[in-house]
Amino acid sequence: LDKDNKGQIYLTIHTGSRHLGMLTYTKFMNEANCESNIPYELKYIKDHLAGLYFHATKACMAFARANRMCIAKTIATKMKWDCNPIIDSYHNYLTVNSIDDQQFMILRKGACSAQLGEKVVIPINMKDGIILGTGKGNENWNYSAPHGSGRTVMRSMVKQNHTVSEYKKVMKGIH
């Protein structure tokens, strides 16, 4: 749960389709690798595969959204809460944008959409919560905002170097 500066409480659910998205990406990159001798680091998905990949990523996003909505509905029902409005914020995705009757694609890796007036959710961490903001629609920033504060240590390193009891101590009083 998070609270804004006006006292409004928000239920925040941070999930995605990380594994499904990785499988989707790997499948299409492997297919692209079959089509030429370009080194993997320089590979890109093109032509018919690009269109299929775009639709596959949309399916991953729909899966992630459905997952969040199911979690939210379960919590809201059990707690007898009215969870409106819902701000659904994606990150790490490909989208088609239309500005002034022109269409273009934006790949957002570590970023979320921040169109003019759009509600923006920027997760900081489990302890400090999220930033709720409003998009500025800045063309120089690809109509985007950062998604999170970034990770300074890989998850695997955290698991190796920290304990659950340390985590509980840091998170004491955080609900």
Residue ranges and their predicted role:
Residues 2-175:
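Domain-length cofactor-binding catalytic modules of enzymes
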